[in-house]
C-alpha cells in the first residue's frame, strides 16, 4: 500500500504530511480495535 501507517499515523495532510497536536482514534467498527490515529487541525 502507498499509505503505510507510518506515513499518516498522528499526522494531517496540508499539502504535505505534518505532525498533528490533536488526534482522533480510527476504530474498526466490526471489532472495536484501534487501527491508528489521525491528526486534525483547529482554527487555533
UniProtKB/Swiss-Prot annotation:
Its EC number is 1.2.1.28. Keywords: Aromatic hydrocarbons catabolism, NAD, Oxidoreductase. It catalyses: benzaldehyde + NAD(+) + H2O = benzoate + NADH + 2 H(+). The keyword NAD applies. One of its GO terms (molecular function) is benzaldehyde dehydrogenase (NAD+) activity. The keyword Oxidoreductase applies. GO terms for biological process: catabolic process. Belongs to the aldehyde dehydrogenase family. This is Benzaldehyde dehydrogenase [NAD(+)] II. The lineage of its organism: Bacteria, Pseudomonadati, Pseudomonadota, Gammaproteobacteria, Moraxellales.
Amino acid at each position: 500500500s502507498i499509505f503505510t501507517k507510518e506515513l499518516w499515523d498522528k499526522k494531517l495532510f496540508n499539502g504535505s504530511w505534518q505532525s498533528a497536536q490533536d488526534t482522533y482514534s480510527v476504530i474498526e467498527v466490526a471489532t472495536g480495535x484501534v487501527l491508528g490515529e489521525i491528526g486534525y487541525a483547529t482554527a487555533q
